[in-house]
Amino acid sequence: MPAPVKPRTTAHTQAPHGMSRRDFLTLGTAAAGLGALGLALPETALATTQAADTNWHAGQLQHLIPAASHDRFLIKASFQAPLTRAPWLMVNGKRVAGEPTDAAGRFWRFDVRGLQPATQYTLRIVDAGGKPLADAWPLKTFPAPNATPARLRILAYTCAGGYDGPAIAGKTAWLDMTARRRLLARGMAFAPDAVIANGDHIYWDLQTSQNKPFARHVRELMWDKFGGALDMSVPMSHPKNEAIFTRVCDYQIGGLYGTTLRSTPAYFLTDDHDTFENDEFDDKVATLPPEPYGLIGAELTQHRYYPEFLPDANRPVWLPGGDKGGMPIDTNSAFGTLRYGTLLEAVLYDCRRFLDNKGMHARVVPQWVEDWLVARTRAEDTAHFFHVPSLPFAYSSGKLGDWYPDLLDKKTGHLVGNQPKPGWQTGWHAQHQRLVAALGQQKQRAAVIVQGDFHASAVGSMSRSAELEFAHPIHAIMTGTLGTGDMGFPSAFRSIETSPALSVAMQEALRPTEKNGFTIIDVTPEKMTFSLFLWRPPEPVDAIDTLQPALVYEVPRLA
């Protein structure tokens, strides 16, 4: 943890979009106490962090993203050129063989088991002859499940993917990659113990980019630069698609992260765009549940670029998304657990991949997954707990994949709940109600949901959901989007801003704010503290390096 430092007094000169001036001044008072959390950094801190990274030599590595538990590391890596023989990962001098995740030998994984909890290891990748391929670096295991750590810090955000190509009619589709990297660097400058990247690591929609007025621009300004159109009639790994697929993912994942996360365990959750489509339903296209080409694409992206979720003693190995050929043993591609001793448990779940259309019986996640989520929510065997769904609770923008029936009335420009929503299933909301009921029934822990997908930052406490009233509110945090450009914010793309769902009673600490950003989550035995950082062009890019929170939101433990 960085040492406490006095926050800069020059931060924040105007209220973020979505906040009144009065709200902003009130929240500014909370932000002034940031030094007590040890969050604020001197102006030179980011420069020092960047310089230290510059001094680390990545060698032939193109990218590297690790996962960790209390006894295991799982690392995905790619190299600038294929390796003809398998590399080794040295772990405190012990060799672990690399396993190829592509046919050419550019992509490799390293699965390190039998480690000691809360222990820092020195890692180094060497070639088959023992020659180093990059500098050594440290990586630490998490505390044992029964340990009692004093604190934990998490960096969380959503929607980091996207190609920052030429503007269309003066509007950007995704944030410039340089600014995106600086936002990531600013978040990493706070020395998080873990990173949660919640969904949409890739934006390369196929059908749902070609049913829009800007379809030609997508083909000419994006697809042609990466080799043309992907062929949906064959898998992404097919020779027709392999080169294009790899260029796209190299740019959006490898190009953003490089080796930045090498010493920080990461949790990459998937969402709709990771299956190469937006969630839509009309008379020509329906993208939920995802088609096989998208599902295979999401699996292949993860197989090569970022780790699956490591096993947890309280998560059944038979859940969907696990137990597949080619995956590391006992891991899961869609449902995961972040367990940090007895301090925190977080459950992560993809809300798109296994969604079904069974009407009143429909589910967003399968029954086995719902059973696991409810059981872990009711266990109350950690000081704190939160859900990390890829689909937000409490908020709506009227799109197909929402938990809610809310629909945009194009005549009034407002959400309505009294019109049929094409493609939407009543069973989705019924499952939503079962999940929030379990959250709201906790006796010792505050109910918290940390969520992604929506291109906004927001914080609110939900006291009612349809017929359910909660004795203690459910705190819903939208962590902020790293990669969204002008055209991707709901007010532009859907002609409506995100807002609390019509069936929800919500006290808003920060109304949905269409800016780029991230959230730092500090966890101690007494409370969780969420610090939300906001920035958006035309604000100066240099301002990112000293960015301070727009909101500091505390959630104490109930008992």
Segment roles from a protein language model:
Residues 1-20, 30:
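N-terminal secretory signal peptides
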Residues 7-11, 42, 46-47, 331:
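A detector of low-complexity, intrinsically disordered, Ser/Thr/Gly/Pro/Ala-rich segments
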Residues 26, 50-559:
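Metal-dependent phosphoester/phosphodiester hydrolase catalytic core
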Residues 31, 38-39, 312, 316:
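Short, polar/charged, Gly/Pro-enriched helix-capping and turn/loop motifs at alpha-helix termini
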Residues 32-33, 129:
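Residue-level detector of secondary-structure transition/capping positions
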